[in-house]
Amino acid sequence: MKKILIFFLIIIVLIAFLSLILAITQKVSIGEKKVALIRIEGIILDSRKVIGELREYSKNSSVKAIILRVDSPGGGVAPAQEIYDEILKLREKKKIIVSMGSVAASGGYYISSPADKIVANPGTLTGSIGVIMELPNFEGLTVFF
């Protein structure tokens, strides 16, 4: 009786451990043809994580397409350009589909543009590729001197 209880405890621990591993990595290797999902959310300040995921999926022959879920108001110009360039390279090997969330503006819109297909909700705020640069205007102060 004690051996059966220990056996079932070991099985439960193994199942819990494997479930935890799958939940952390979000990768389930079932089947031959897969679609990968990469989330790009918030302000784009760093490209390393997204580029790392894109490169990882580009090497995986079982991944046939990549969905980019973009929900970003933009961010830094350099990281957006780096992600854009990586998507252009990857597009030669895999299908790229962009799904726009609430906002895909500025850099979010820019990184979406090289995709094979872009899907947006009717209420998605999108567009406006550009850079805003604010400078102080001291023109009125010079009158006093």
Which role does the model predict for each range below?
Residues 1-95, 102-145:
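Small-residue-centered hinge/linker elements
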